Amino acid sequence: IAGVKATRALRCDRVSPSIGPHAIYTVSKEAWQWCAQYARDEDLLLQYHLSETEKEVKDCQKLNGMRPAKYLDRIGVLGPRSIAAHGVWLDAAEIALLAKRNVSISNNPASNFKLGVGRLFPYEKVAHAGANLTIGTDGAASNNSLDMFSSMKLASLQAKLLNAPTAMDARTTLDCATLNGAKALGLDAGFIMPGKLADLILVDL
């Protein structure tokens, strides 16, 4: 709470506080519910890891009788101001649930590869469900880099490996890294047009 107040006291429109409970295996039910309610009360983004490994899924089924996304929905966590990172082990029903709740899903391919999560991100299922798909890097310790261009390339290549050479084309990949990311963060950006935030970079090709 002090961190949120201190960040808002800066009155800087380029810095926004958020709540980041790590994952279902490190955060108690009561703490999850507190975080979700506080985020709603203060209109904060709620970001967390979800279904990153098979063990996480199996442990959740054993302890709670359901898969991780269903568990978070049951305790009132899922919502439009949420970003679920990884999602490698989500099944089709969970992906549909996240899309229904307007939860953004962040694919972190470099981190997934480095940590050996045991499966590729289910791009085709996420795209079919219409969920807001973004691309992330995870932390530097899980990636050895925070290079978004590298993550964009890896995300596109892994989608092609599982599906077809034309899956996740350049336009889609760019949208995931820019427009969809802005939507997930609640930013009026992602387009180059009058009235939008000028969130721009120059790339030397």
Give the ranges of each region predicted by the language model.
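Catalytic core of soluble alpha/beta enzymes
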Residues: 52-103, 113-125, 139, 143-149
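Metal-coordinating catalytic core of metallo-dependent amide/deamination hydrolases
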Residues: 1-89
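Glycine-enriched alpha-helix->loop->beta-strand junction motifs that scaffold or abut catalytic
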Residues: 36-45, 77-80, 97-106, 128-133, ...
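His/Asp/Glu-enriched, well-ordered alpha-helical/loop segment
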Residues: 74-81, 123-205
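Alpha-helical segments flanking ligand/cofactor-binding loops in enzyme cores
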Residues: 33, 37, 70, 95-96, ...
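Conserved active-site and cofactor/substrate-binding residues in soluble primary-metabolism enzymes
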Residues: 2, 14, 26, 30, ...
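Short beta->alpha connector loops at strand-helix junctions that form conserved
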Residues: 108-109, 137
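Conserved beta-strand positions in the central sheet of alpha/beta enzyme cores
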Residues: 47, 85, 106-107, 202
